[in-house]
């Protein structure tokens, strides 16, 4: 699957054919009929829409013929949180999930997915906004782990954590000021929260 789709007809067809579009970039103040239709389709799918200047679109464009719209498409299909929990149930294991708070670098996301797979995690949860999605770079860096590790995308990571707590899960955050992991009893239904490269775990998630 292509990582990026450009041009009005191609982008509209991507939405209508059911492709998983992570982000849509639209020329700011462009309000003609085809663009309005694309925006309407994007909102139906709850896609992140970024209204940007022409210079930004030109910078992102791989073809030089974006016509004011660029869609970034997930290289892999997303799972749901329930899919991840079901995977744990099928194995007869307590859920073990990695939750990533605004990871921006695709190489980092791919490496974390690889680590999650090696650690025996049942899946990874990422937020829809302010974070990289499942690009081809992520897939390549994961070294095949993306084929075995489901990734779910949620609107509100903090809310998802609260819902999982009700399911009996508990959570630890990777934090420079925290305790040594060797001093903790890391057993049972558990989630590991990893924060942004620069800011760490956000206050709302902590």
Task: For the regions a language model picked out, list residue spans one by one.
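N-terminal positively charged helical leader segments and presequences
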Residues: 1-87
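Short basic, glycine-rich beta-strand/loop surfaces that mediate nucleic-acid
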Residues: 60-75, 142-145, 150, 187-195
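Hydrophobic/aromatic ligand-binding patch that stacks against planar heteroaromatic rings
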Residues: 13, 41, 115, 163, ...
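RNA substrate-binding interface of SAM-dependent RNA methyltransferases
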Residues: 16-19, 86-179, 183
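Short acidic active-site motifs
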Residues: 10, 34, 56, 156-160, ...
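Short secondary-structure boundary/capping elements
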Residues: 3-6, 79-80, 104-107, 152, ...
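Active-site/ligand-binding-proximal alpha/beta "capping" segment
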Residues: 172-206
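Glycine-rich nucleotide phosphate-binding loop and flanking beta-alpha elements
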Residues: 11-12, 32, 77-79, 106, ...
């Amino acid at each position: 699957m292509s990582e990026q789709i450009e041009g009005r007809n191609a982008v509209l067809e991507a939405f209508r054919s059911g492709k998983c579009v992570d982000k849509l970039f639209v020329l700011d103040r462009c309000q003609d009929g085809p663009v309005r239709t694309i925006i309407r389709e994007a909102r139906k799918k709850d896609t992140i829409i970024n209204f940007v200047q022409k210079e930004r679109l030109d910078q992102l464009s791989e073809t030089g013929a974006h016509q004011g719209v660029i869609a970034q498409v997930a290289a892999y299909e997303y799972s749901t949180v329930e899919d991840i929990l079901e995977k744990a149930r099928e194995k007869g294991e307590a859920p073990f999930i990695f939750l990533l708070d605004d990871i921006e670098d695709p190489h980092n996301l791919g490496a974390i997915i690889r680590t999650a797979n090696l650690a025996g995690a049942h899946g990874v949860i990422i937020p829809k906004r302010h974070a990289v999605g499942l690009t081809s770079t992520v897939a390549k860096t994961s070294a095949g782990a993306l084929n075995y590790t489901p990734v779910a995308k949620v609107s509100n990571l903090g809310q998802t954590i609260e819902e999982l707590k009700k399911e009996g899960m508990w959570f630890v955050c990777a934090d420079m000021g925290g305790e040594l992991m060797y001093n903790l009893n890391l057993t049972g239904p558990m989630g590991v929260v990893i924060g942004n490269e620069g800011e760490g775990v956000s206050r709302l998630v902590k």
